[in-house]
C-alpha cells in the first residue's frame, strides 16, 4: 500500500514564498519545493544570484584582459574580436576561446552581425536550427548563418551583385524578423551626363529567422517616398523613412508586403523575375526585388524634429522628440501618439550646463517608463492618466538618482605653486572634478539598473558601476573598475549576471576588453 503524503509535506505554490534569504531559497530548490516548471526555477535561481551579488562582502575581480586592433563586441555571454572572426565565451570563470574562423581578405570580412537566440516555443525540423546562431554580413554581400558555439556555416545567402550591402543589419521584430539595407545609391557621372535621374535611394531585404526565410526585397524610390528621403529602417513592423528636412514618416510594412509583393520567393529555388533567371540567394543572381512599390502607402504617422529623431514607446503609446526649432534645443517633448497632444509636464528639460548632452529613452524593462539621464541626475519617469480623465496623460517622476556634488568646494582651486584661487566661472555639470554619470544600462534578469559614474583622482578618471534597484532607485552596491577612464576615448560597459565587461578604445586606435567576475570570500573552515 502506498501512503498519501500529508498536507504539510505537499509542495507549496511557488508564488506564495516570501523568503528573501538565499540559504532558504537554496534549500527549497534542493528539496524540489521551489517550483514545478523551468521558468519559475530560473526566476528563483536569478533571485538567489541577485541576493548574493548585492551582499556587502561580494566583490567583482578582474580576471582577464585582451587587446584588439578592431572594435570589440559583446552579446549574451560571447565576446567577439577581429570583426567577429574570434569568439570567446564569458560564461566560464575566465573567458575561453569558443571558435576562430579562418582569415579572409578585406573584401570578404564580416562587417555586421546579429546574435539569434534559439526559439523556446517552437520545435524546428532540423536540430541545428534549434540552437543559437550568429547572423553575419560580409563585405562582398554574403549573409551567413553561423553556429554561435562552433562558427560552423549553417546557411548562406547572396544578396546582390549590383547593390552594396554594408553595416546595415537590424531587428524588425527582435528574434523574429530582421532586415538588411544597401548603401545609398548615388548618381553616376554617366547618368549625370545623360540627364538620367537615379531615383532609387536603396534596397531593403527582410527575412524571418528560425528557419531562415525571405520575406521580400524592396526598393526605396524617391518618386514614391519623396525626393528628400535619405534613410530608412524597419522596426516593430513599421517602415520609417527619414528626410533631409528633419521629417520622418512611418508606414505599415505588413500593408506594403500584402499590397505590393508580386511573388513569394523561397531561398534556394529557381526564380524568373524582372527579366532575369537564377536561384534565389545564390551568386550571382542574389535576391531579386519582389516588392514593387509603385504608389505611396498610407502614412501612419509623421513628425518633424530638431535632432535625435523620434522614439515611440510607453504604456499607452507615446513618442519623444525635440520640435524643429532652435528655441527647443535641449528639451524633449512627450506626446500621445493617438492625437499628438503634449502630456502634462511633458516637456523634459535637464537644463544641463555641460559639454555632453543629456539623453532620453523608453525603459527597456517594458514597464512603459522613461529614462532621462544627464551628467548629474537620472530621472525615471512614468506616463499616468490625469485624475478624472482617462484620455489625457501626465509625466510624473517615479524616482531620481543624483550624483554627489559639493558646490562650495568646487569654487576654490589650488595652483601648482600653492596659491588659492577662486573660480570666476561656474563649473560645468560634467566637469572632471565632479562625480558624473556616463551611462545607464538595465540588467533584465536581475532587475537592476547599472549606472557608470566617473570621478577624478590624481589626474585620472576612476569609474564605478553603481547597482540600483529598478523599482525604487535605491543604491544597492558600488563596484570600482580598475582601469582609468579617459573621457576622450569611447567606452562601453556591460553588466550580465555575475560578469562585468568593460571595452575601451585606447591610444593608436587600439581596443581593449576587461572582464570582471563575481567573487565571494572563502568560507571559514573549522
From Swiss-Prot:
Any one Pfam family match given in the protein's UniProt record, by short name: DCAF17
Name of protein: DDB1- and CUL4-associated factor 17
Recorded name of the encoding gene: dcaf17
Function field: May function as a substrate receptor for CUL4-DDB1 E3 ubiquitin-protein ligase complex.
Pathway per the UniProt entry: Protein modification; protein ubiquitination
Species of origin: Danio rerio
Membrane topology recorded in Swiss-Prot or TrEMBL: Multi-pass membrane protein
Entry keyword NAD: no
Stored PANTHER family: DDB1- AND CUL4-ASSOCIATED FACTOR 17
Annotated S-S bridges: none
Amino acid at each position: 500500500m502506498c501512503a498519501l503524503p500529508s498536507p504539510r509535506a505537499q509542495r507549496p505554490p511557488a508564488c506564495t514564498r516570501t523568503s528573501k534569504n538565499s540559504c532558504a531559497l537554496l534549500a527549497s530548490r534542493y528539496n524540489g519545493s521551489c517550483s514545478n516548471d523551468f521558468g519559475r526555477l530560473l526566476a528563483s535561481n536569478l533571485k538567489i544570484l541577485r541576493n548574493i551579488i548585492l551582499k556587502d562582502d561580494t566583490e567583482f575581480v578582474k580576471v582577464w584582459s585582451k587587446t584588439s586592433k578592431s572594435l570589440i563586441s559583446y552579446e549574451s555571454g560571447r565576446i567577439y574580436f577581429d570583426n567577429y572572426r574570434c569568439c570567446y565565451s564569458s560564461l566560464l570563470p575566465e573567458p575561453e576561446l569558443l571558435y576562430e574562423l579562418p582569415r579572409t581578405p578585406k573584401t570578404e570580412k564580416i562587417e555586421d552581425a546579429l546574435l539569434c537566440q534559439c526559439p523556446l516555443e517552437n520545435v524546428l525540423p532540423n536540430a541545428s536550427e534549434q540552437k543559437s546562431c550568429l547572423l553575419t554580413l560580409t563585405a562582398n554581400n554574403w549573409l551567413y548563418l553561423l553556429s554561435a558555439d562552433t562558427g560552423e556555416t549553417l546557411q548562406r545567402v547572396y544578396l546582390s551583385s549590383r547593390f552594396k550591402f554594408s553595416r546595415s543589419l537590424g531587428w524588425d521584430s527582435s528574434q523574429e524578423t530582421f532586415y538588411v539595407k544597401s548603401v545609398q545609391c548615388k548618381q553616376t557621372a554617366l547618368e549625370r551626363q545623360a540627364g538620367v535621374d537615379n531615383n532609387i535611394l536603396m534596397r531593403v531585404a527582410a527575412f524571418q529567422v528560425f528557419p531562415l526565410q525571405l520575406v521580400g526585397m524592396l526598393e526605396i524610390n524617391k518618386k514614391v517616398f519623396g525626393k528628400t528621403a535619405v534613410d530608412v529602417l524597419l522596426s516593430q513592423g513599421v517602415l520609417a523613412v527619414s528626410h533631409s528636412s528633419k521629417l520622418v514618416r512611418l508606414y505599415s510594412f505588413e500593408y506594403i508586403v500584402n499590397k505590393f509583393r508580386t511573388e513569394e520567393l523561397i531561398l534556394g529555388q529557381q526564380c524568373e523575375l524582372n527579366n532575369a533567371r537564377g536561384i534565389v540567394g545564390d551568386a550571382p543572381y542574389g535576391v531579386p526585388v519582389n516588392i514593387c512599390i509603385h504608389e505611396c502607402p498610407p502614412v501612419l504617422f509623421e513628425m518633424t524634429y530638431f535632432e535625435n529623431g523620434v522614439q515611440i514607446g510607453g504604456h499607452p503609446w507615446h513618442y519623444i522628440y525635440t520640435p524643429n526649432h532652435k528655441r527647443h534645443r535641449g528639451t524633449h517633448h512627450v506626446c500621445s501618439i493617438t492625437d499628438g497632444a503634449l502630456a502634462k509636464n511633458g516637456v523634459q528639460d535637464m537644463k544641463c550646463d555641460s559639454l555632453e548632452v543629456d539623453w532620453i529613452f523608453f525603459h527597456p524593462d517594458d514597464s512603459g517608463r522613461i529614462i532621462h539621464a544627464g551628467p548629474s541626475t537620472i530621472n525615471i519617469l512614468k506616463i499616468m492618466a490625469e485624475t478624472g480623465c482617462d484620455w489625457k496623460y501626465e509625466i510624473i517622476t517615479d524616482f531620481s538618482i543624483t550624483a554627489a556634488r559639493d558646490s562650495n568646494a568646487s569654487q576654490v582651486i589650488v595652483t601648482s605653486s600653492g596659491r588659492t584661487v577662486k573660480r570666476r566661472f561656474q563649473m560645468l555639470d560634467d566637469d572632471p572634478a565632479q562625480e558624473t554619470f556616463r551611462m545607464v544600462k538595465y540588467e533584465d534578469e536581475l532587475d537592476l539598473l547599472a549606472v557608470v559614474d566617473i570621478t577624478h583622482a590624481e589626474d585620472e578618471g576612476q569609474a564605478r558601476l553603481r547597482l540600483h534597484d529598478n523599482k525604487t532607485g535605491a543604491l544597492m552596491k558600488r563596484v570600482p573598475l580598475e582601469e582609468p577612464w579617459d573621457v576622450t576615448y569611447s567606452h562601453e560597459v556591460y553588466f550580465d549576471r555575475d560578469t562585468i565587461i568593460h571595452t575601451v578604445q585606447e591610444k593608436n586606435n587600439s581596443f581593449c576588453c576587461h572582464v570582471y567576475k563575481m567573487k565571494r570570500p572563502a568560507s571559514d573552515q573549522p
